[in-house]
């Protein structure tokens, strides 16, 4: 998680501020270390400040750009729906195959396109909203109520917030990004992403409406979003490591924690300077490994989750 966030941040800074990834990696690793060694309270406070500011700023700027292209919204919506079912890229080929009566080939191409779209959409969606991974439970567990009844009420409240976060992140945030890019770059979006990267393309889209200020807005949002997420992933890993070492002698546990801290900071730096394709591939594998045991646990604990509501 932290490597992808660091890579996206470095990409946006390279476009907006002409800052090389090496420099971004050093600065980001140092800032991360300053917050991490302040403990869980500093991590929670920093994230609680950064996330609302960055989300509000991005929604405002992106919404202005999208509504300035209001006449293109129906066409963009059609592209999104077609792409979701793998129809957009293969439309011309499918039509040609139908004329030649190659219905089997046409169906196979369409099926492959749908499968590829679903695989890509699920993997990117899971990385974005972390639905089904079990990671958000660790973060929401930081909120505690006094007394048994208050603890139960707080747990239910945090569960509802977790559901809302998935909706907000995917339906609102990701949809806004899709409309933003497709409205501004209706014909050359692939080339823009290949040359600038994902966050660089978003910066270019905002710059098309706001000029240099658009790039600054994107850079600021990416810094706030990515930094808050990097801190959150550290806390998740730290809590998991603490549980695994609950029976380990304290001195040995302290040494392992130091190694974890150093390895995490190194991962933040490497994320800024690594090829994103390789990082995405590794992240997809580990997300799958996280989802399997968590989804199995959700099925087994389903009755206990429903029981307090009866």
Functional labels for PLM-detected ranges:
Residues 15-18, 163, 202-218, 243-256:
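Transmembrane-helix boundary/entry motifs in multi-pass membrane transporters
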Residues 25, 145-168, 248-259:
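Membrane-interface alpha-helices at helix entry/exit sites of multi-pass transporters
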Residues 8-13, 19-28, 32-81, 241-242, ...:
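Membrane-interface loop-to-helix entry segments
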Residues 1, 27-34, 50, 60, ...:
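Hydrophobic alpha-helical transmembrane segments of multi-pass membrane proteins
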Residues 35, 117, 124-130, 134-155, ...:
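Helix-loop junctions at the membrane interface of multi-pass solute transporters
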Residues 26-27, 92-128, 172, 209-224, ...:
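Select transmembrane alpha-helical segments in multipass membrane proteins
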Residues 61-81, 85-102, 108-109, 141-153, ...:
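Extracellular/periplasmic helix-exit of transmembrane alpha-helices
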Residues 1-17, 197-202, 223-245, 262-272, ...:
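Hydrophobic transmembrane alpha-helices that form the core helical bundles
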């Amino acid at each position: 998680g932290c490597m992808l966030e660091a890579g996206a941040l470095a990409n946006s800074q390279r476009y907006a501020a002409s800052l090389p990834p090496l420099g971004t990696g050093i600065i980001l690793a140092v800032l991360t270390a300053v917050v991490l060694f302040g403990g869980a309270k500093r991590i929670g406070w920093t994230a609680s400040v950064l996330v609302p500011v960055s989300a509000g700023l991005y929604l405002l700027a992106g919404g202005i750009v999208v509504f300035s292209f209001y006449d293109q919204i129906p066409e963009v919506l059609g592209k999104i729906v077609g792409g979701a079912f793998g129809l957009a890229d293969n439309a011309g080929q499918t039509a040609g195959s139908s004329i030649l009566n190659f219905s089997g080939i046409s169906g196979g191409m369409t099926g492959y396109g749908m499968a590829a779209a679903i695989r890509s959409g699920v993997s990117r969606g899971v990385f974005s909203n972390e639905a089904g991974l079990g990671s958000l439970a660790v973060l929401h567990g930081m909120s505690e109520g006094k007394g048994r009844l208050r603890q139960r009420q707080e747990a239910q409240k945090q569960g509802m917030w977790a559901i809302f976060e998935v909706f907000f992140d995917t339906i609102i945030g990701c949809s806004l990004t899709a409309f933003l890019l497709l409205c501004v770059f209706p014909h050359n979006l692939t080339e823009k992403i290949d040359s600038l990267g994902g966050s660089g393309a978003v910066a270019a889209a905002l710059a098309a409406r706001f000029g240099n200020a658009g790039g600054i807005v994107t850079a600021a949002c990416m810094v706030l979003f990515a930094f808050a997420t990097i801190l959150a992933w550290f806390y998740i890993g730290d809590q998991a490591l603490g549980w695994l070492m609950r029976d380990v002698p304290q001195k040995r546990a302290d040494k392992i924690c130091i190694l974890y801290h150093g390895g995490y900071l190194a991962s933040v730096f490497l994320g800024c300077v690594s090829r994103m394709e390789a990082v995405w591939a590794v992240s997809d594998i580990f997300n799958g490994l996280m989802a399997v045991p968590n989804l199995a646990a959700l099925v087994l604990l389903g009755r206990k989750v429903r029981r307090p509501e009866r």
